[in-house]
Amino acid sequence: MDNSIKLAKQKKVSGIVTLPIIKKTLIENGFNYPGHTEYLGKISNKKPLMIMLNQKLKVATLTTHIPISQITKKVTKKNLENTIQIYINSLTKDFGIINPRIAVSALNPHSGEEGKIGKEEINIIKPIIDKFKKKGKTIYGPI
């Protein structure tokens, strides 16, 4: 992994493809990161953004390798705003999409049913979406 990072920093490669790892084995040998994404973030001193893509679809995740019990702690206005901005920057710079159109998913079933089964959509997700809309971004959600 470190050799791949070195080649990327030297601009000798355009990207890195990572393969599945057995986290237990790595942790037992001193690799104290839950996955490649977090390690790459630490090495680059940047917030990592995991993007999965194919010819028709590009998906970014707000969280990386964390237990489901910790997800709601990571769904904050600051994290969501930073993630969306990084994603917009990547879509524009890395993929040449001039005005990216982004859909933001809901956290709760049925987008929280207007607060009846979760308030994250009302208190966190929608205000951040509205903030990007005010900046002229094409963004939808929570979906």
Features from the language model and the residues they span:
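Anion-binding alpha/beta catalytic cores of soluble intermediary-metabolism enzymes, centered on
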Residues: M1-I143
